[in-house]
């Protein structure tokens, strides 16, 4: 719960205890042996300490928008760039207390295309732990636009007898 008032926490604890009365017994649901508990947190290489200035984000989005709107059939675009950095702390009653950091960089492009018969929308995105691994803005925008344009003026498929493999 995000409500950390004492009254609310007491109610939450009571509800949790009450819920356990309806839980069937499970011989495999127990605390692990102490020798199985973690003693350290390994570095999983999930954190990029790169700092992205707002000007860099704006430049990336401008390139993304330019590539996404390059075809005259594209009538609208929406692009975004987000950056997230988190800290996780793990602790137990045996004295273990350690943590790790994660980061993510995400860019997306949504495009709307129109022709004389239809209007369609599609998107593409890239989400990576490391900024350097994020897809190129131009490629991402072009991919979103191409996917959207391919959906325009769909053709009906006629009935036919075909083999189905299960």
Regions found by a protein language model. Name each.
Residues 1-166:
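Active-site bordering "gate/hinge" segments
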């Amino acid at each position: 719960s995000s409500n950390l008032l004492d009254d609310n926490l007491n109610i939450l604890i009571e509800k949790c205890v009450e819920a356990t009365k309806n839980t069937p017994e499970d011989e495999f649901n127990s605390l692990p042996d102490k020798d199985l508990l973690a003693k350290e947190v390994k570095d999983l290489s999930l954190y990029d300490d790169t700092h992205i200035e707002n000007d860099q984000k704006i430049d990336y989005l401008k390139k993304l928008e330019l590539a996404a709107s390059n075809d005259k059939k594209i009538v609208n675009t929406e692009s975004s760039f987000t950056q997230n950095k988190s800290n996780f702390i793990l602790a137990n009653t045996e004295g273990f207390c350690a943590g790790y950091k994660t980061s993510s960089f995400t860019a997306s492009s949504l495009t709307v295309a129109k022709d004389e018969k239809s209007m369609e929308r599609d998107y593409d995105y890239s989400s990576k732990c490391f900024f350097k691994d994020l897809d190129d803005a131009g490629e991402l925008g072009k991919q979103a636009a191409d996917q959207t344009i391919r959906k325009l003026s769909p053709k009906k498929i006629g009935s036919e007898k075909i083999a189905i493999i299960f």
